[in-house]
Amino acid sequence: MNRLIVKYAGYSVNKAYVAVDGQTLKFGKNGECAFETEKSAVTVSVFNVLEAASASYYLWSILYFFISIFGIFDSYRDFKCRKIEAEFIVRLSGETRVTVRNRAFNKKGESEAVSIECDCGYEVVKNTQYIDKPAKRRTRIMTAVRIVLFIGVIVLIAVIAGNL
């Protein structure tokens, strides 16, 4: 039985998921997770899911805008829409430790998404991060809509207060 111990050290902005052979890992408080398998090699994937990439983004964004009292108590979102796609084939022998670290984003274009440190050998299948253009466009449109809604609410409050 081979054992893979994965440690993920990443920026919280990226909110990336780590999966081994398609099974998403849940990390403990120490940032490590163990995965046991009979295979001699496993596929480690690192990816993120952008909120703005979903088809219902506009609906949910408007709903959260009103629930969060017109955006005042809204949670932080990555408005830069950075997409992470990395996949590695890691060869196992006994207990293998893998550390996955996020890399800084290169503004000039595509860059490596993560760096990996491994006790045994590994092979890079893909390792890119880039800006998701459709998600970025949706984010810009929604930001403009939120600004217009916020100004509309302030005008509505002013009109109601003026009539009293």
Report the location of each language-model feature.
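Short loop/turn and low-complexity linker motifs enriched in small/turn-promoting residues
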Residues: 1-164
